[in-house]
Amino acid sequence: MTLCFSAKYRSVSRYAMVLLATCAALSASVGHAQTLRVALAEDPDVLDPTVARSFVGRIVFASLCDKLVDIDEKLTIVPQLATSWVWAPDNKALILKLRKGVTFHDGEKFDAAAVKFNIERHKTMAGSNRRGELSPVTTVDVLDDMTVRLNLSQPFAPLLAVLADRAGMMISPKAAAAAGSNFANKPVCSGPFKFHERVAQDRIVLERYDGYWDKASIHFDKVIFLPIIDPTVRLANLRSGQFDFIERVSPSDITALKTDSRIKISRIPELGYQGLSINIGKSDQAQKNPLGKDVRVREALELALDRPGMVQVSMDGEADVGNQWVSPSNPYYAKNVPIPKRNIARAKQLLKEAGVPNPSFSLMTPTTADGQRLAQVIQAMAKEAGFDVKIQSTEFATSLNLADKGQFDAYLLNWSGRADPDGNLYSFYGCKQPLNYVGFCKPEVDALLDKSRSVREPAERLKIIEQIAAITSKEHAILYLYHRHWLWAQTKKISGMRLIPDGLLRVQGLKPN
């Protein structure tokens, strides 16, 4: 019997209805190795790399949009659309040699002019979430057809790591100009698969691009991405043969899956974090709640949380306890700011000093099973200190829009992380940065963030990051809880998955056994 559930009912509490269109799409591909079927934990946001910001969107982009460079299993920068690069002697320019023979999905040539268009679009387009990532890039020079130079206002150590993600994704200038603000409805990139269709909350279908420069590495004709919130339903469909890969397997299912000879589990420690973001200045709403306007209340909340217990209860041990934007095992972890231990007595004392022994706030939470479980754990732990936490379950894309507007008290936010720590830090604490949902703004931190970006020597850079950690940790605007393990499950009928630390599924090299 085919297990196929409507997007409307892909939630923790609903299991019964069937969406015929999705079933038909899936059933048509059953038994055909040429179609790769991937279940996502959420529906991706916009399919435009300039404005996109979801992890699941990055999974789709990995099949759709090639980047200038990529990372490998050891976080080494490796070629993709750029074949080589060299820094200027003063480290204030990066010169990239581009791959010849690459075309976009509309047949247009990829060249230096296309790179210039894309970088400038990332920097100037209204609503761009890449602007902060590329802020040190001042101008882009086309040196010849296949050579481009990125000029910088100051040395920028994370630049190559930035170009290994959405800021380095190249879209067709011709298609972008023609589509305008509607580009995301039919994105045109240069990756191994081209866009075919999207049905919101149901499926994204990509078809093989025959003109792909590395087509020998592609062994499927089609990729179908299906958002299914409930991990139980994702797993049931994998076991029934409807899916080939599922992401974010529920940690509680890992033990049982180890005995299933048909299924392979991949575990990848994430580069990012699970955090609790608090609105301290994003909007007027921050001043309407004790949590937003009094740092003592925020410190009390942090002291009410038992991180090791949280990892065991909400993640079944499939995460590493943390308190910063990178994990304690990362070379850029600031050891001068250790993980705080739970202290209920001190938390109650702080609330008493703040004059709010029983503060109440809403916790905006994704509708995923993991998100709901974590919110309930936080609710129970915080209650012991006197907090009344009201869980506000919100669809993921909607939660991002509300966070943008500052319409929240606190927000459970997963950040998938970047190869360079700057990607976990700059856009979240810089005064005018697009991912600064909490409204944190300190000129001294802005100066340190810029200084950190300009230093390439690791030991010197760590000293700057330690200063940033010392300041931000006292504000408790983002409570870093833990660092998850990306848990992928797949049929053993397919081989070739690479365990890259960003947790993304790369289709190059995947093939049926």
Question: Model-flagged regions — what are they?
Answer:
Residues 39-89, 117-120, 188-189:
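N-terminal lobe/hinge region of extracytoplasmic solute-binding protein
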Residues 89-90, 144-146, 200:
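Residue-level recognition of beta-strand termini and adjacent short loop/turns
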